[in-house]
Amino acid sequence: MDLDQIVADAQQSFEGAADITTLENEKARFLGKSGALTELLKGLGKLDPETRKTEGARINVAKQQVEAALNARRQALADALLNQRLAAEAIDVTLPGRGAGAGSLHPVMRTWERVEQIFRSIGFDVADGPEIETDWYNFTALNSPENHPARSMQDTFYVDGKDADGRPLLLRTHTSPMQVRYARMNRPPIKVIAPGRTYRVDSDATHSPMFNQVEGLWIDENVSFADLKGAYTDFLKKFFERDDILVRFRPSYFPFTEPSAEIDMMFEHGKNAGKWLEISGSGQVHPTVIRNMGLDPERYIGFAFGSGLERLTMLRYGVQDLRLFFENDLRFLRQFA
């Protein structure tokens, strides 16, 4: 029984195996059910006890040597496969790197921050309020009686639930409720803007069910339309970064201001030269609203204005369709990065 030859043959066969499949086939020749060493182990039963003990020990040593050679070759093949994969996935550190994509503000948020910065620079505070508003703050406090058309389901999103007095809750239709909320917590002189999201049942190229608005309020003992025109004209020139802007006031109607006016602007030069563009609603704060602020309308007077942040953004960047701001198309948004 030439065990040394069997071990040598096994080691040579294993070493010559180029892959795991071939190696397993070679293993069967020596360690399988009909393998050389297996057959020798089966034949031990025919030997006398003393010889069986001696030969059994020799066969087990040979088997251990074959298994050691088998495991060594398995590890070598596994290492070779790993090295091959690593080589295929290797990164050439000498290649130029790829620039990471940098995020940027949404164009409407750029406008939001710019509006805040400009009004802060001319002495206005910035306030924020709840988007789910009470019926009283959204309508009644702003001189909109209970039968006002704006309260209908066609224009306002009502939500489940009531306020502490049992009145309906709604998604605010403007940021104007902050006029009353802020004035009740601060004494005149009051100069504040309130940017924020608002909601109305409306959707087309120039309207969205959700849009952003900035409300402005100035309350003091001697405030006039001249102050409104001066402050808003100064804002427009800083926002659009140009001085060739004309501003006009057109009579209008808003329940919370009297008199009321639409604010139009016109560029004297450039693409939109000579065109009056509607930019904001405004007016002198209605005495009823001042009274609801907890102030004496015989003593205090002021003005308010409301501008759509999407509208300002559209005019600044020449965007024609409001809906583009909400479609999250990176091809569109990257233009403002």
Curated annotation (Swiss-Prot):
It is found in: Cytoplasm. Its main location: cytoplasm. CDD domains: PheRS_alpha_core. One of its GO terms (molecular function) is tRNA binding. It catalyses: tRNA(Phe) + L-phenylalanine + ATP = L-phenylalanyl-tRNA(Phe) + AMP + diphosphate + H(+). It holds the Pfam family tRNA-synt_2d. One of its GO terms (biological process) is phenylalanyl-tRNA aminoacylation. Keywords: Aminoacyl-tRNA synthetase, ATP-binding, Cytoplasm, Ligase, Magnesium, Metal-binding, Nucleotide-binding, Protein biosynthesis. Binds 2 magnesium ions per tetramer. Its cofactor is Mg(2+). GO terms for cellular component: cytoplasm. Mg(2+) binds at residue 258. It comes from the Bacteria. Its EC number is 6.1.1.20. PANTHER family: PHENYLALANINE--TRNA LIGASE, MITOCHONDRIAL (PTHR11538:SF41), PHENYLALANYL-TRNA SYNTHETASE (PTHR11538). Belongs to the class-II aminoacyl-tRNA synthetase family. Phe-tRNA synthetase alpha subunit type 1 subfamily. Tetramer of two alpha and two beta subunits. This is Phenylalanine--tRNA ligase alpha subunit. It comes from Burkholderia mallei (strain ATCC 23344). The gene is pheS.
